[in-house]
Regions:
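Alpha/beta-hydrolase-fold catalytic nucleophile elbow
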Residues: 55, 111, 135-138, 163, ...
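Short alpha-helix in the alpha/beta-hydrolase fold that links the catalytic acid
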Residues: 34-39, 172-182
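Serine-hydrolase catalytic machinery in alpha/beta-hydrolase-like enzymes
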Residues: 2-107
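Short beta-strand/loop motif that positions the catalytic acidic residue
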Residues: 162-164, 168
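Primarily recognizes the serine-hydrolase "nucleophile elbow" in alpha/beta-hydrolase
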Residues: 104-153
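Short, conserved loop/helix-junction motifs that constitute active-site signature segments
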Residues: 41-46, 151-157
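C-terminal catalytic histidine-bearing segment of alpha/beta-hydrolase fold enzymes
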Residues: 160, 177-218
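Alpha/beta-hydrolase fold active-site loops
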Residues: 19, 158-159
Length: 218
């Protein structure tokens, strides 16, 4: 575990939160991207949750002609794996920080969209403490061949919600389906949702996420 805590936004749905959701944005966005989603979830009044929305570091991104932008990793194969491992360590540091603040790891959920979903899966499946769940939206599984050797027994029973757009032009739904099947092979519990949308989030998905979060945290 190394490095400073990532810059982030914190939103609390009530006093003295009893749970936390760490939600990772996609390529080129920042923590503000999912800030408007939090009130739309309309979580129960009795469920006080701290939402932590970190900003990815800025780095040179090959598909952006090397221009620096916020990204959890460069999709260049020669650099991507190292970036993903680095980002996973940074997210682990956020998880550990919530435990230091008094929350059980079983009250923590990792969530992510697109690139953020890759990091949520990369981190959560290998984390050495049991989590409340992993939420992976419009995303895929990085280097699934290594997962069988690296996954954490502590999180083998962690519920996973995956959701994807049928018309996603950025990360085709076939990649999400492939990730789901790889997780099934390792006996993970995956709930799968798909929607008539592109690379985005839709109202029905928000409602489904709300129900899933509530079921995991109450």
């Amino acid at each position: 575990m190394s490095g400073e805590i990532l810059e982030h936004i914190e939103l609390e749905t009530g006093d003295e939160p009893s749970a936390a959701v760490i939600w990772l944005h996609g390529l080129g966005a920042d923590g503000h991207d999912f800030e408007p989603i939090v009130p739309l979830l309309e979580l129960p009044d009795a469920l006080a949750v701290r939402f932590i929305l970190p900003h990815a570091p800025e780095r040179e991104v090959t598909i952006n002609n090397g221009v620096r932008m916020r990204a959890w990793y460069d999709m260049n194969p020669s650099q991507g794996h190292a970036d993903i491992k680095e980002s996973a360590l940074q997210i682990e540091a956020l998880l550990e920080r919530e435990i230091e603040r008094g929350l059980s790891s079983r009250r923590l959920i990792l969530a992510g969209f697109s690139q953020g979903g890759v990091i949520a899966l990369q981190t959560g499946l290998r984390y050495r403490r049991p989590l409340a769940g992993i939420l992976a939206l419009s995303t895929y599984l990085h280097d699934h061949a290594r997962l069988a050797d690296e996954y954490s027994f502590e999180n083998l029973d962690t519920p996973i919600m995956m959701a994807h757009g049928l018309m996603d032009p950025m990360i085709q739904i076939a990649r999400g389906v492939s990730a789901r099947e790889e997780l099934f092979k390792l006996n993970y519990k995956v709930e799968w949702f798909e929607y008539a949308m592109g690379h985005e989030v839709c109202p029905q998905e928000i409602a489904d996420i709300s129900r899933w979060l509530t079921s995991r945290l109450t």
